[in-house]
């Protein structure tokens, strides 16, 4: 299957092996939850928390250890962000590109890139509103430059 905004094809990748907790993990459930909470309170985004748990603590997946995903742990502890991380990153990218286009109005390639980022954001907002992650009254124009 092809990628969305390019002519390149997708790349096949390895699949995660889900199942029981691996035998090499030395941490209890409480220690893993405390580590997640401490990392989030220190300002680390959820995707980086997963990478740190994998690389520094030897925990391949939070779901295998705790039985629930990282986002669920954060929402139970009241540490979930108002805007999902992927949408927030797209908003930052859009604002940076929009600022660049204001300074360089003849840069047609980045104008197109800005439009593609906006299209992706609109699709994500529609999905998050449909699934209940974002409130129906949430508006994208409030967070854009």
Swiss-Prot record:
This is Small ribosomal subunit protein uS15. The keyword Isomerase does not apply. Transmembrane segments: none annotated. It comes from Thermoplasma acidophilum (strain ATCC 25905 / DSM 1728 / JCM 9062 / NBRC 15155 / AMRC-C165). Part of the 30S ribosomal subunit. It holds the Pfam family Ribosomal_S13_N. Keywords: Ribonucleoprotein, Ribosomal protein. Belongs to the universal ribosomal protein uS15 family. One of its GO terms (biological process) is translation. GO terms for molecular function: small ribosomal subunit rRNA binding; structural constituent of ribosome. GO terms for cellular component: cytosolic small ribosomal subunit. The keyword Ribonucleoprotein applies.
């Amino acid at each position: 299957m092809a990628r969305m905004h390019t002519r390149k094809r997708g790349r096949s990748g390895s699949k995660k092996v889900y199942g029981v907790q691996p035998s090499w993990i030395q941490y209890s459930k409480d220690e893993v939850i405390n580590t997640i909470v401490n990392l989030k309170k220190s300002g680390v985004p959820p995707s980086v928390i997963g990478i740190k748990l994998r690389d520094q603590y030897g925990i391949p997946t939070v779901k295998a250890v705790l039985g629930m995903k990282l986002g669920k742990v954060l929402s139970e502890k009241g540490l979930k962000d108002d805007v999902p991380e992927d949408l927030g990153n797209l908003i930052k990218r859009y604002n940076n590109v929009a600022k660049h286009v204001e300074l360089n109005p003849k840069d047609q390639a980045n104008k197109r890139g800005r439009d593609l980022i906006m299209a992706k954001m609109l699709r994500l907002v529609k999905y998050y509103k449909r699934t209940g992650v974002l409130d129906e009254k949430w508006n994208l124009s409030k967070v854009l430059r």
